[in-house]
């Protein structure tokens, strides 16, 4: 299977203020980038899939980023600046299909999108319910919006419609849908990181706990426990004993103790949606 992650432009201005001028797939989440999560999920479903990502051709990758792309085996396609999404996708697909079998199903995942449970059947559009007032493509019923994941069993036909609809990716998808109906697949775990508000909301739902720890974030509170109770207790002690003049710079400890169900030590903190250093 062939997968294109569309990340050929830079993040919007609000996100640029926070993170600088970067492509959306390189947005940080904890100690990783978004594309590392995307590639990990895709490989979980299909280990041998070929993953491509479009990046602005004027973006200068750091040595760390180059190493990361090599490690996760994602092939970079540099695309010219100032292209529409439709033009960028068409440009990328023309490069891909010069070298690879064009009979394989094509999957497209937007670079600012994370979906944990993917469907690998052909000819689908992933949709989700949303009341947010963003420029997402909407279906006619039930407030369903397109959430950035598509598949096409006839890539050549989709490329033809992209060629005829260079100014509108949506129009190309709709034209394909008229000829080969695309099944709407409802997803409950869509995370959109393409806007500042949705980025912080999404990030709070992706914890970075290690295997021996348990962490959850809910209603503005971080709850943490783990196998090593002494370590968890020591962390809680640290928060309890921060000098008063320093507490303004740290999240407030809400409670700590022994969990009644697991019998393990835990503590909970105020959740502050700040970016890590």
Where are the language model's segments positioned?
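Short, acidic, metal-binding catalytic loop of nucleotide-sugar glycosyltransferases
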Residues: 40-48
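Short beta-strand/loop segment that forms part of the nucleotide-sugar
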Residues: 48-58
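ATP-binding glycine-rich loop module of kinase domains
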Residues: 210-240, 270, 277
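Conserved beta-loop-beta/alpha segment of the NTase-like Rossmann-fold superfamily
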Residues: 60-134
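N-terminal nucleotide-binding beta1-loop-alpha1 segment
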Residues: 1-22, 26
């Amino acid at each position: 299977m062939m997968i294109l992650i569309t990340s050929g432009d830079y993040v919007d201005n609000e996100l640029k203020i926070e993170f600088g001028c970067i492509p959306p797939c390189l947005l940080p989440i904890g100690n990783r980038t978004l594309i590392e999560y995307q590639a990990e999920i895709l490989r979980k479903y299909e280990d041998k899939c070929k993953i491509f990502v479009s990046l602005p051709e004027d973006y200068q990758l750091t040595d760390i980023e180059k190493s990361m792309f090599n490690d996760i085996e994602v092939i970079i396609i540099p695309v010219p600046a100032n292209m529409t999404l439709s033009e960028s996708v068409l440009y990328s697909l023309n490069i891909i299909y010069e070298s690879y079998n064009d009979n394989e199903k094509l999957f497209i995942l937007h670079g600012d999108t994370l979906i944990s449970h993917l469907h690998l059947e052909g000819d689908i559009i992933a949709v989700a319910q949303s009341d947010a007032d963003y420029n997402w493509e909407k279906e006619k019923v039930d407030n369903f919006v397109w959430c950035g994941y598509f598949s096409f069993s006839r890539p050549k036909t989709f490329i033809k419609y992209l060629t005829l609809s260079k100014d509108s990716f949506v129009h190309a998808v709709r034209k394909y849908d008229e000829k080969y109906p695309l099944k709407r697949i409802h997803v409950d775990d869509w995370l959109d990181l393409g806007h500042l508000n949705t980025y912080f909301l999404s990030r709070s739902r992706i914890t970075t706990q290690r295997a021996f720890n348990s962490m959850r974030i809910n209603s503005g509170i971080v709850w943490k426990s783990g196998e090593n109770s002494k370590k968890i207790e020591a962390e809680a002690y640290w928060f309890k004993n921060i000098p008063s003049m320093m507490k303004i710079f740290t999240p407030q400890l809400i409670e700590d103790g022994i969990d009644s169900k697991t019998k393990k030590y835990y503590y909970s903190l105020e959740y502050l949606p700040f970016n890590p250093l």
